[in-house]
């Protein structure tokens, strides 16, 4: 626990210094750019804690095995299915691991490399869209996404790239966004969900179409058994067909506290939608992305597998939530800032012993 506490302190304090030593930049949505040099310090802390971990995280052994199996391929063409009966699952990621095997057979290089890529894209995005910057970075840990990224590392890496690509949703550059999604799908095929998402989130927040989509998800949640029988047919011939039986019989779902954390920012965003739009007209896109995260969270109360989709949407809370410290008078904003830090710290503290197997923390130096 002490490692995580020190890491959080370093990340928060040095992100604050980066903000204080930054300067005005009207090319950014925030109008302010943190100090580019100082950003490297919190980034380094995030990478080191994640990249040097050993047997930490629910999926650690699974990814270690994937790394070893990737080294068994004879060439990259075999990974992508040229001249073989079947393409490797998520061939882009498998090819990356295959290349790493030429450097070392130690899978720790995989964890370190993925940490560098994932957190670099997230920090870059928060530097462009997060204000106050240090609060956005703190929320990466406070919302538990940082610790959850120790599991499902390839999906979090893809989610980080698509998080960075929000600039193309905002600008309406669908060609670049779709290209990034297609390349990302080679690393995790679920990234393809972001193609229809592009068209959904560019609508005005709280519009009839968005309310209609929300009603659809509510219906799927309440009529879950009927919905899941259709969903299983979709999975039947995919690389995820092994989930069929598990989906039909599993009753383990996302807990109510996580749902509350997803819905509260949306409630505030609805109540103060005009104030938010006055600060940044494109905030509707971020609100819609957060809403999709909540809707998938509702489905995840029936089966936790749907929480995997929330990986793509939960990151946008790091952009939305800090806006709430800018919509009231100065004194109220300061109180809200403190409340956000305290509440999200307690949230991550309570989750840590029971979620994602991040405790106890061990490093490669203890193996």
Swiss-Prot record:
What turns on this gene?
Repressed by SinR.
Localization, UniProt: Cell membrane
Q: Which UniProt keywords apply?
A: Cell membrane, Exopolysaccharide synthesis, Membrane, Transmembrane, Transmembrane helix
Q: What membrane topology does this protein have? A: Multi-pass membrane protein
One Pfam family name is EpsG
Quote the cellular component terms of the Gene Ontology held in the record: plasma membrane
Output the GO biological process annotations, alphabetical, semicolon-separated: polysaccharide biosynthetic process
Membrane spanning residue stretches:
1-21, 37-57, 77-99, 109-123, 133-153, 180-200, 215-235, 252-272, 279-299, 304-324, 334-354
Give the function comment from the record.
May be involved in the production of the exopolysaccharide (EPS) component of the extracellular matrix during biofilm formation. EPS is responsible for the adhesion of chains of cells into bundles. Required for biofilm maintenance.
Q: What is this protein called?
A: Transmembrane protein EpsG
The upper taxonomy is: Bacteria, Bacillati, Bacillota, Bacilli, Bacillales
């Amino acid at each position: 626990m002490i490692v995580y506490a020190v890491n959080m302190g370093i990340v928060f304090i040095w992100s604050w210094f980066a903000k204080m030593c930054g300067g005005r930049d009207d090319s950014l949505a925030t109008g302010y750019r943190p100090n580019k040099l100082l950003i490297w310090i919190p980034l380094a802390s995030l990478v080191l804690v994640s990249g040097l971990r050993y047997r930490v995280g629910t999926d650690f052994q699974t990814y270690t095995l994937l790394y070893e199996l990737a080294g068994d391929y004879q060439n990259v063409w075999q990974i992508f299915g040229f001249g073989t009966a079947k393409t490797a699952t998520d061939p882009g990621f498998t090819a990356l691991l295959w290349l790493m095997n030429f450097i070392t057979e130690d899978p720790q290089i995989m964890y370190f490399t993925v940490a560098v890529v994932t957190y670099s894209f997230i920090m870059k995005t928060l530097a462009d869209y997060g204000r106050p910057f240090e609060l956005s970075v703190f929320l990466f840990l406070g919302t538990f996404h940082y610790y959850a990224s120790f599991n499902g590392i390839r999906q979090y890496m893809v989610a980080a790239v698509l998080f960075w690509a929000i600039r193309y949703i905002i600008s309406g550059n669908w060609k670049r966004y779709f290209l990034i999604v297609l390349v990302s799908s080679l690393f995790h095929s679920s990234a393809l969900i972001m193609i229809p998402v592009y068209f959904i989130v560019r609508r005005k927040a709280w519009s009839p179409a968005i309310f209609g989509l929300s009603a659809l998800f509510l219906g799927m949640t309440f009529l879950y058994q009927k919905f899941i029988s259709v969903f299983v047919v979709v999975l039947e011939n995919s690389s995820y067909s092994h989930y069929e039986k598990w989906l039909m019989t599993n009753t383990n779902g996302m807990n109510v506290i996580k749902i509350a954390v997803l819905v509260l920012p949306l409630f505030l965003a609805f109540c103060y939608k005009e104030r938010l739009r006055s600060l940044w007209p494109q905030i509707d896109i971020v609100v819609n992305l957060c809403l999709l995260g909540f809707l998938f969270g509702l489905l995840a109360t029936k089966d936790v597998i749907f929480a995997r989709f929330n990986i793509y949407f939960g990151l946008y809370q790091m952009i939305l939530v800090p806006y709430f410290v800018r919509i009231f008078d100065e004194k109220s904003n300061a109180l809200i800032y403190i409340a956000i830090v305290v509440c999200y710290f307690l949230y991550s503290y309570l989750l840590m012993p029971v979620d994602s197997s991040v405790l106890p923390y061990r490093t490669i130096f203890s193996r």
